[in-house]
């Protein structure tokens, strides 16, 4: 299994998430639900960004909170409320990605940016909302990710 959530429970003051989910490799899965249903919480559990109050979360056969740096480099993530500093250009972001991800493919990334009309020398703060979303997705798929998690609104 690529992802396993077994008897997982996460409690907040006004919300409790309980779930079991097994996702095999080579699948495309969508989580659909109302705002506040627990989709983002589920993704954060999968990524080891938060710990469950009960149950086990495994990714690549390992506990999510114990993924190595090498394992984490296999993850491509897009969260609507995250990203690089808006004072950077796409070229600067590309150089940063090369430093952090050995499998980052800059030529492919820049080619895709051109295809989707993402200006490489303009600061991200000058981008439209749609251009920022495209950039996040292009970054997530430009480093040979084995698991892609998109949490967009």
What are these regions (language model features)?
Residues 1-20, 25-27, 68:
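A short, flexible loop at the N-terminus of ABC-type nucleotide-binding domains that lies
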Residues 55-66, 70-71:
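Conserved ABC transporter NBD signature motif
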């Amino acid at each position: 299994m690529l992802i396993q959530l077994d008897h997982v429970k996460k409690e907040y003051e006004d919300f409790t998430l309980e779930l079991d989910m097994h996702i095999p490799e080579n699948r495309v899965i969508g989580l659909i639900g109302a705002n506040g249903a627990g989709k983002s919480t589920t993704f954060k559990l999968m990524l080891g960004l938060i710990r469950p109050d009960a149950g086990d979360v495994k990714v690549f056969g390992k506990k999510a909170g114990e993924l190595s740096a090498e394992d984490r480099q296999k993850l491509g993530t897009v969260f609507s409320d995250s990203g690089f500093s808006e004072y950077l250009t796409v070229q600067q972001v590309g150089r940063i990605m090369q430093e952090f991800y050995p499998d980052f493919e800059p030529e492919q990334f820049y080619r895709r940016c051109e295809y989707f009309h993402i200006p490489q020398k303009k600061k991200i703060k000058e981008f439209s909302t749609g251009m920022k979303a495209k950039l996040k997705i292009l970054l997530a798929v430009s480093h040979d990710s084995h698991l892609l998690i998109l949490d967009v609104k």
